[in-house]
UniProtKB/Swiss-Prot annotation:
InterPro entries associated with the record: CD200R (IPR040012), CD80_C2-set (IPR013162), Ig-like_dom (IPR007110), Ig-like_dom_sf (IPR036179), Ig-like_fold (IPR013783), Ig_sub (IPR003599), Ig_V-set (IPR013106)
Tissue specificity comment: Expressed in granulocytes, monocytes, most T-cells and a subset of NK, NKT and B-cells (at protein level). Expressed in the spleen, lung, liver, testis, bone marrow, lymph nodes, spinal cord, kidney, uterus and small intestine. Expressed in mast and dendritic cells. Expressed in the lung of N.brasiliensis-infected mice.
Quaternary state and interactors: CD200 and CD200R1 interact via their respective N-terminal Ig-like domains.
The protein's name in its UniProt record: Cell surface glycoprotein CD200 receptor 1
Native source organism of the sequence: Mus musculus (Mouse)
Signal peptide as annotated in the record: 1-25
């Protein structure tokens, strides 16, 4: 009779847990194990949470008035296990999980849910909530997997080829192309569990100018369009944003230099003309003085002042020269 009552009470608690569970937590890939020879009821759940988001893990939804002890057993990969426990009768809270960013979602006397405010790769592991009641123990296991969206890059290469890369994703991303080409895909695993996938494709058809790289991942899908190169000049396209500004700057500098040179010439020519005029003016007084003081200038003046005929010159050359005083 006692066993029948205990089994009936256990069934009521199970029905209550199933009815209330959907109101607070959403569990995926859930499997339930129930051994009829033991009052222990166990539920195994796999949960995938994106990195940087909040995770909320729930125990069996059993009224706290029926619970005696609620214990979270946390086993993170690469770290020793720790526990967070709450005794209902004494309302005492005990924890050995300090510094791991794992706490009660609220006060345990209100709700025994566990909260991770910002999920990181270090939070991967198993989380077990064990609820002890007079009717039996209820255990809920979570296998927490952290999702990391990949960083996607893509670029064209020579000879009508293109590269698409999904870096550091968890799990590994899937890369496909449209239209299909001759593709080679490689992957590289990292120490933190992330994977980098790189796909290189080549298209022989000349009528294919644009292709699409499709990256599929649990955190979301991406479709990227790439224009294939048509010749060697396409390899310069990534450098065009740097080449054009450099050419413009060189043109501006050249114009400034030409303006400075032309302005210097205009300023220099008037100075040269003014200098020549000053030198000529300075020479004129000296020439006047020389002309006045030199007897040779007087003689020439006299000869020019008294011209003679041709016959007189022929007959009286010596007399004339003597008379003049030469």
């Amino acid at each position: 009779m006692f066993c029948f009552w205990r089994t009936s009470a256990l069934a009521v608690l199970l029905i209550w847990g199933v009815f209330v569970a959907g109101s607070s937590c959403t569990d995926k890939n859930q499997t339930t194990q129930n051994n009829s020879s033991s009052p222990l009821t166990q539920v195994n759940t796999t949960v995938s949470v994106q990195i940087g988001t909040k995770a909320l893990l729930c125990c069996f939804s059993i009224p706290l008035t029926k619970a005696v002890l609620i214990t979270w057993i946390i086993k993170l990969r690469g770290l020793p296990s720790c526990t967070i426990a709450y005794k209902v009768d004494t309302k005492t809270n005990e924890t050995s999980c300090l510094g791991r960013n794992i706490t009660w979602a609220s006060t345990p006397d209100h709700s025994p849910e566990l909260q991770i405010s910002a999920v990181t790769l270090q939070h991967e592991g198993t989380y077990t909530c064990e609820t002890v009641t007079p009717e039996g123990n209820f255990e809920k296991n979570y296998d927490l997997q952290v999702l990391v969206p990949p960083e996607v890059t893509y670029f064209p290469e020579k000879n009508r080829s293109a590269v698409c890369e999904a870096m550091a994703g968890k799990p590994a991303a899937q890369i496909s192309w449209s239209p299909d080409g001759d593709c080679v895909t490689t992957s590289e695993s990292h120490s933190n569990g992330t994977v980098t996938v790189r796909s290189t494709c080549h298209w022989e058809q000349n009528n294919v100018s644009d292709v699409s790289c499709i990256v599929s991942h649990l955190t979301g899908n991406q479709s990227l369009s790439i224009e294939l190169s048509r010749g060697g000049n396409q390899s310069l396209r990534p450098y065009i944003p740097y080449i054009i500004p450099s050419i413009i700057i060189l043109i501006i500098i050249g114009c400034i230099c030409l303006l400075k040179i032309s302005g210097f010439r205009k300023c220099k020519l008037p100075k040269l003309e003014a200098t020549s005029a000053i030198e000529e003016d300075e020479m004129q007084p000296y020439a006047s003085y020389t002309e006045k003081s030199n007897p040779l200038y007087d003689t020439v003046t006299k000869v020019e002042a008294f011209p003679v005929s041709q016959g007189e010159v022929n007959g009286t050359d010596c007399l004339t020269l003597s008379a003049i005083g030469i």
